[in-house]
Regions:
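Alpha-helical transmembrane segments in inner-membrane proteins
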Residues: 1-335
Length: 335
């Protein structure tokens, strides 16, 4: 790698980190009540004796921290799924993984009476895992194996079917499922440090597994035969990457609800400026994903003031045309 490329990637990382700090500051300052920089500093540094503005900032801190964590996790999950399937359209939402996790939680609430975050995570991971395996199996049928188009179609069809099942379960239980219906929109409001701490171990494990698989996934981009020739165990690499992606997505979905398109948009933005090497794409996507989610959440609060629009709805509104652009630009070819 040339010193120019190395220097450029360092500059990109510094720029992304700076953008993330700006997004975090905007998340703390904007909303139904805008606060000043001095109030942000006071709200972050004080433990008591808050002014009204500082109190608002203090209450927004868990939301902003969770936005950072969830954005990183979803972007890394999308990056890993794109690498595992060699599909530029792969994303936890497009492949139906988010919807599978949501359906599992609905079933758990309606029929098994689950209520704790740990139970939510267990059901979300189960639903995400089963859906990921099912979509990949369906997409692998027929001539050519698991092509990008077939995986996207299988994921979209599966997501639509699972969404209808979610609605079928929700409709007769309008009163008891009101809280879940709000959760289903996908958002980071109402996050607490306790909830973040509960999902943090799974996210750390998923991120560690993804980082361990980066070298082999880079080789996998050359094709299975070439990767095998380089000594890569393709089946194990795909399994490791898939498990990491499901852990990252499932844990985040359990607390935030299904937030789509973050895992699709962030990796593509990063590849445009940093190239295809996953050693750089994965960490930069995490930073970009956190920035995008915080911007979506902040925009939802500003546009919907004095109420708010959930971040999942904003990201879907922005991400849908980007999906069309990516499909047209790449002609849906494999990575």
């Amino acid at each position: 790698m040339s010193s120019w490329n190395h220097g450029r990637r360092c500059l990109v990382f510094i720029a992304c980190a700076g953008l993330l700090l700006i997004c975090a500051a905007l998340s703390l300052s904007l909303g139904s009540r805008q606060v000043t920089l001095a109030e942000i500093i006071g709200g972050v540094t004080k433990n008591a004796g808050f002014t009204m503005g500082e109190l608002v900032v203090h209450q927004r801190i868990p939301r902003t921290v969770f936005g950072l964590v969830a954005g990183c996790a979803l972007a890394m999950s999308g990056t890993l799924m794109q690498a595992v399937t060699r599909n530029p359209l792969a994303d936890p939402g497009i492949l139906g993984v988010n919807t599978g996790a949501a359906l599992a939680i609905v079933v758990g609430i309606a029929f098994f009476g689950i209520g704790s975050l740990v139970q939510y995570m267990a059901f979300a991971l189960l639903g995400a895992s089963v859906t990921a395996v099912f979509v990949y199996a369906v997409g692998s049928l027929g001539y050519g194996g698991a092509t990008p188009v077939k995986l996207a179609l299988a994921g979209t069809a599966t997501s639509a079917a699972l969404s209808s099942l979610v609605s079928l379960i929700l409709l007769p239980r309008s009163t008891s499922m009101d809280a879940f219906r709000f959760w289903q929109s996908g958002g980071i409001g109402g996050a607490t440090f306790g909830g973040i701490a509960s999902i943090a171990p799974l996210i750390v494990i998923g991120a560690a597994l993804g980082i361990c698989a980066v070298g082999s996934l880079n080789a996998l981009a050359l094709g299975d035969d070439a990767a095998a020739g380089l000594g890569v165990k393709t089946a194990r690499t795909r399994l490791l990457g898939a498990v990491a992606g499901v852990l990252l997505c499932g844990a985040t979905t359990a607390l935030a609800g299904p937030i789509g398109f973050i895992g699709l948009v962030a990796p593509h933005i990063v590849r445009l400026i940093a190239g295809p090497d996953l050693r750089y794409v994965l960490p930069l996507s995490a930073v970009a994903g956190a920035s995008v989610l915080l911007l979506a959440d902040t925009a939802g609060r500003v546009i919907g003031s004095p109420g708010e629009i959930e971040a999942g709805l904003v990201s879907a509104f922005v991400g849908a045309p980007i999906l069309v652009f990516i499909a047209v630009r790449s002609k849906v070819r494999a990575l």
